[in-house]
């Protein structure tokens, strides 16, 4: 038995300079797990609650001392003495103790930090790397793959202070044979994009996720700049590198008018018009994945978009599904989207995260493992992507150590696993096999 002997919570700082929760779980035998909760900027309305103190005299109200107190008191008292290797039981104890539908008593940030720290401690006690332990928890021991990265190299929307409405323009280095090579291709395109933007007189400051955040004239111009950068780097768009976008449409959807208002371009669209706008972009550029291409509540719009684009484009639900099996189940039954974005802190525990990945895969949906815009040096999502053989990961650009930490962990894992973890490339993307 991997007996829990101590649980410690503390307030640390994330990549945006805001507080977040870090937890340590200590086991008999001296094994320790350490994990931190990430934090989102554009959040789905049905996400589990991230508990903030609201005390304006500390961190502008964003302190997390209440969540930390829950870790150090109620949660610690409930799990000390329990077996850390029973992850589902530990997570359920915390969920039941919280007692709310959205983890609002203790905060998903408190429960998640302990959940992940517990898994890390249990893995250490078994002498396993975290990815191997996650594969065991997932019921797929020894089954691994290296994920295709979606690298967010131009940031807009809520992730940047600019006039670009679409939140993320991403590259996927599909021509790579290994994860390490994919990272190299991404880096080369990133540096060439800096040169392209500079030559056009644009700012090369970066956004929350390490991508550039210039004031471009249109969303199409962002794609044109990326195309030029790919070619300057010596690669062919569509063959070596494909494109993906996160529209984060809920951020520019006007619920009163029912229109998608792209202020950066001075244009507005009905739900169906916006789908056809995206369809035109897909004809002009090799865009193989679109995330949140409609407002999270516009299920009719999503159904139409799935009908129009779903055979050839991966349609990823983020704000739409919020890593929640109840919502995902309904989406699967209604034929909404064909992929889910997986974010630990949207649901708030490792067990529930694994359940969402399994449900998606069983239904023929893909699962894209994702960071949040507020991150730390914690690289657990790298192990999650490999240990569940998810096939795809979204963890930012080629700058900011909070992003690069995940790529570096993937490089280490690939080195350790060798040919036991194949890099699937474009085959991992829905509609591209």
Curated annotation (Swiss-Prot):
GO terms for biological process: glycolytic process. Pfam families: Enolase_C, Enolase_N. Pathway: Carbohydrate degradation; glycolysis; pyruvate from D-glyceraldehyde 3-phosphate: step 4/5. Gene3D superfamilies: Enolase-like C-terminal domain, Enolase-like, N-terminal domain. The keyword Transferase does not apply. Catalyzes the reversible conversion of 2-phosphoglycerate (2-PG) into phosphoenolpyruvate (PEP). It is essential for the degradation of carbohydrates via glycolysis. (2R)-2-phosphoglycerate binds at residues 167, 343, 372-373, 394. GO terms for molecular function: magnesium ion binding; phosphopyruvate hydratase activity. PROSITE patterns: ENOLASE. Component of the RNA degradosome, a multiprotein complex involved in RNA processing and mRNA degradation. Its cofactor is Mg(2+). The keyword Transit peptide does not apply. Keywords: Cytoplasm, Glycolysis, Lyase, Magnesium, Metal-binding, Secreted. It is found in: Cytoplasm; Secreted; Cell surface. InterPro entries: Enolase, Enolase-like_C_sf, Enolase-like_N, Enolase_C, Enolase_CS, Enolase_N. SMART domains: Enolase_C, Enolase_N. Belongs to the enolase family. This is Enolase. It comes from Actinobacillus succinogenes (strain ATCC 55618 / DSM 22257 / CCUG 43843 / 130Z). Mg(2+) binds at residues 246, 291, 318. It catalyses: (2R)-2-phosphoglycerate = phosphoenolpyruvate + H2O. The active site is at residues 209, 343. Binds a second Mg(2+) ion via substrate during catalysis. Its EC number is 4.2.1.11.
């Amino acid at each position: 038995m991997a007996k829990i002997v101590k649980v410690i919570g503390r307030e640390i700082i994330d990549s945006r300079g805001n507080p977040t929760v870090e937890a340590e779980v200590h086991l008999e035998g001296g094994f320790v797990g350490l994990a931190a909760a990430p934090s989102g900027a554009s959040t789905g309305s049905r996400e589990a609650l991230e508990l903030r103190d609201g005390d304006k005299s500390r961190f502008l109200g964003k302190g997390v001392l209440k969540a930390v107190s829950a870790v150090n008191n109620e949660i610690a008292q409930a799990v000390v003495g329990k077996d850390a290797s029973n992850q589902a039981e530990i997570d359920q104890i915390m969920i039941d103790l919280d007692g709310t539908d959205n983890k609002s008593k203790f905060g998903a940030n408190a429960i998640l930090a302990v959940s992940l720290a517990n898994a890390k401690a249990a893995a250490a006690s078994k002498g396993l790397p975290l990815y191997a332990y996650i594969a065991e928890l997932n019921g797929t021991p020894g089954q691994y793959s290296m994920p295709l990265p979606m690298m967010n190299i131009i940031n807009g929307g809520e992730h940047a202070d600019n006039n670009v409405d679409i939140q993320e323009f991403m590259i996927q280095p599909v021509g790579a044979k290994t994860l390490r090579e994919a990272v190299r291709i991404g880096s080369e395109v990133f540096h060439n994009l800096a040169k392209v933007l500079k030559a056009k007189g644009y700012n090369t400051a970066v956004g929350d996720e390490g991508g550039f955040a210039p004031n471009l004239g249109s969303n199409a111009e962002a794609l044109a700049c990326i195309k030029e950068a790919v070619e300057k780097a010596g690669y062919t768009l569509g063959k070596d590198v494909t494109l993906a976008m996160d529209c984060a449409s809920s951020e520019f959807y006007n619920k009163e008018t029912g229109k998608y208002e792209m202020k950066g371009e001075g244009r507005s669209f009905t739900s169906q018009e916006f789908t056809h706008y995206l369809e035109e972009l897909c004809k002009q550029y090799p865009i193989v994945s679109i995330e949140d291409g409609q407002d999270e509540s516009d299920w009719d719009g999503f159904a139409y978009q799935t009908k129009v684009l779903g055979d050839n484009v991966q349609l990823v639900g983020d704000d739409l599904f919020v890593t929640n099996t109840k919502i995902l189940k309904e989406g699967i039954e209604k034929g909404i989207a064909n992929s889910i974005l997986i974010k630990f802190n949207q649901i708030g525990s490792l067990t529930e995260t694994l359940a969402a990945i399994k449900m998606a895969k069983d239904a023929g949906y893909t699962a894209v493992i994702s960071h949040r815009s507020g991150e730390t040096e914690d690289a657990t999502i790298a192990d999650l992507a490999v240990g569940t053989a998810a096939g795809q990961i979204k963890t930012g650009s080629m700058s900011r150590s909070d992003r690069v930490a995940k790529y570096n962990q993937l490089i280490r894992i690939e080195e350790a696993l060798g040919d036991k973890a194949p890099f699937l490339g474009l085959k991992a993307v829905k509609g591209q096999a």
